[in-house]
Each structure stands twice: as C-alpha cells, then as structure tokens.
C-alpha cells in the first residue's frame, strides 16, 4: 500500500485529490528557507548581539544552519497541512538538510552543510539517469508535473534534468572548496536559483514539441 505522505504521479490522482499549493505560496515555501539561511549568515553577528542566547550555537554559519533546518521543517509542515502530501524532491532535500545540518551543529564543522547540495543533486541525478538505464523515465515522480509528454519527450527531459543535477553537484563542490563561506552562501541563494530558472525555460521548446494533445490522450 502506498503511504499517503509520498506524492503519486499526478496522472493517477482524481480531481478531488489534486489539492495544490498556490503558485506564489509554493515559491515562498521553496525560497523561504534559503532566504532565512542567507540572512542569518549575513546578519548572524547582529542577531547574536540582540539575542545573546544564540551565541551558544556558534559562528553565523552555524546559526544559519540551525535556522535553515527550522525553516525547512516549517515549509514542509505547511505543504503537508495544505495538500496532505509531500512532493518527493522537497521531502528528500528536507531530510538531507536535517541530517547534514545536525552533523554540522553536532561536530561544529560546516563542511557537512556545504556538502548537502552535492549529495542531494547527485542523488537526484543518479536516480534519473539510473532509471533511464533501466528503461524508466522517472521525472514524473520527481516533479509535480501538470503536463503530459510522449515517451520520447519524457526520456529526453529526464536525461537533461539528470545531467543538470550532476552539473549542479559539481558546481557546488567547486564553489565551496575554492571560495569563502559567505561567497558559497550567496551563490547557493542567488546563483543556483537563476541558473535553474534559465535551464527550466530552455526546456520549454522540448516540452511543447512532445506535449500530448487531448486527441493523443484519448487515443492512448
């Protein structure tokens, strides 16, 4: 039996089941924890001055990690409250945030939180590319897709996203290993999101080319 916490392929849901988060709120839930992370790292010393109890957590990057974990839990809780499901991608990312964030705070070593994007993106890339290797286009189970594509379209889109996730993992490794913590945090918030948006927009011609019309759906 499928556990209700995991979101099924939208094509298998009835209209009554498709309780969706409004687009602006969905964007806020995705960006909110990252903005909290950026603000806490950039203004950590100010926060510690105003709230001395926070000094026990440590340097700004550790305070940012703790608040990032809290904001991630809140975002997932809001999503669950509104839809009674959790999309696979935010759920897995949230679990990794909590695990690596806890290691960061426990061991007082920011390497763990810096490696979190590498782990998450490598995992998603490996799942998508591994699925293709076994003849499965798994993209529909990773994204809350509202569109329908033919088999070739799903294969191409899955390949592109799989390679893109691997690219993001490599970029994260290069940035955190060669630049300052502040530079890495800024790139994580203000670099990755624009890159992802541009990449997503570049996929629109492929999506339009391989979209199934109503006639295609009826025939299938």
Swiss-Prot record:
* Domain of life of the source: Bacteria
* UniProtKB keywords: Cell inner membrane, Cell membrane, Membrane, Transmembrane, Transmembrane helix
Which Pfam families does the UniProt record give? IspA (PF04279)
The answer to whether the entry has keyword Membrane is: yes
- Where in or outside the cell? Cell inner membrane
The UniProt entry lists membrane topology as: Multi-pass membrane protein
What protein name does the entry list? Answer: Inner membrane-spanning protein YciB
- Organism, per UniProt? Brucella anthropi (strain ATCC 49188 / DSM 6882 / CCUG 24695 / JCM 21032 / LMG 3331 / NBRC 15819 / NCTC 12168 / Alc 37)
Gene from which this protein is expressed? yciB
């Amino acid at each position: 039996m499928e556990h209700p916490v995991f979101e099924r392929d939208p094509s298998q849901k009835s209209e009554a089941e498709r309780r969706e988060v409004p687009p602006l709120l969905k964007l806020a839930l995705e960006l909110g924890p990252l903005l909290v992370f950026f603000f806490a790292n950039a203004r950590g010393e100010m926060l510690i001055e105003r709230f001395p109890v926070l000094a026990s957590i440590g340097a700004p990057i550790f305070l940012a990690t703790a608040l990032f974990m809290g904001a991630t839990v809140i975002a997932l809780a809001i999503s669950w409250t509104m839809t009674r499901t959790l999309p696979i991608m935010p759920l897995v990312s949230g679990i990794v945030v909590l695990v690596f964030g806890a290691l960061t705070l426990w061991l007082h070593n920011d390497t763990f939180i810096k490696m979190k994007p590498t782990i998450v993106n490598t995992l998603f890339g490996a799942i998508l590319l591994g699925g293709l290797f076994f003849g499965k286009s798994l993209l529909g189970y990773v994204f809350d897709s509202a569109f329908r594509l033919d088999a070739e379209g799903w294969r191409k889109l899955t390949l592109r996203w799989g390679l893109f996730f691997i690219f993001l993992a490599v970029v994260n490794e290069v940035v955190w290993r060669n630049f300052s913590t502040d530079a890495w945090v800024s790139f994580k918030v203000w670099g990755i999101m624009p890159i992802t948006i541009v990449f997503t927009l570049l996929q629109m011609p492929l999506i339009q080319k391989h979209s199934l019309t109503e006639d295609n759906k009826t025939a299938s």
